[in-house]
Amino acid sequence: MTDQLQGSPVLAEVLGDALPKLERFHAKIAEEGEPRGLIGPRDVDIIWERHILNSAAIVPYVRNATNGIRFKTVADVGSGGGFPGLVAAACLPDHDFTLIEPMERRIEWLHECVGLMQLQNVEIIRGRSDAVIQQVRKREIHPFAVVTCRAVAPMTKLSGWTLPLLKPSGQLIALKGRSAQAEIDKAGKEIAKFGGRRPRVVEAAVGPDLEPTHVVIVDKR
């Protein structure tokens, strides 16, 4: 089945120099994603828009968050099939990405994709975010400038899984659906508890003539 955007000039316009790497990623997930439980059967012909371009929508916000920061470190929580972590890493080769994922079969997939895409800026950790949070608290690893995620959990839970990973003045950048504003309205207490402030929703461009997505941004005190 051919992807609806295959060969479209939109891909080069949005993805730029990352396109060759992401074409290899697209081919792999189009062939293996459904049987390996990474995408649904109805996604096979819309992988570019629903998964890759949707993930790339966070790239300008990550760049903005790390502007002027020497160590541009990004943690991607619940990386799953590589959305948004692998896509963002391909688009931002000057940033160091740590993909955090608890499931072994998804860890295997991520390692395969990192090799296929020849990404030199990605580290993969098998584990839950709370284990990595403990490493940050014990100063075994440095906190991150940015934490990203997509379709992991509602903000009431996500706040505690992500905000403690951030350095002061860092940012959580989370891809969300249409209920994003309702989620942050409901999670005000949890956001504040874990050091977050100024939660807001932005409408992020996916590509020309494509439906935009929603991104939640939370600053770390």
Curated annotation (Swiss-Prot):
Gene3D superfamilies: Vaccinia Virus protein VP39 (3.40.50.150). One of its GO terms (molecular function) is rRNA (guanine-N7-)-methyltransferase activity. The keyword Transmembrane helix does not apply. Transmembrane segments: none annotated. The keyword S-adenosyl-L-methionine applies. Keywords: Cytoplasm, Methyltransferase, rRNA processing, S-adenosyl-L-methionine, Transferase. Its main location: cytoplasm. It holds the Pfam family GidB. It is found in: Cytoplasm. Its EC number is 2.1.1.-. S-adenosyl-L-methionine binds at G78, F83, R150. InterPro entries: rRNA_ssu_MeTfrase_G, SAM-dependent_MTases_sf. One of its GO terms (cellular component) is cytosol. Belongs to the methyltransferase superfamily. RNA methyltransferase RsmG family. HAMAP family: 16SrRNA_methyltr_G (MF_00074). Specifically methylates the N7 position of a guanine in 16S rRNA. This is Ribosomal RNA small subunit methyltransferase G.
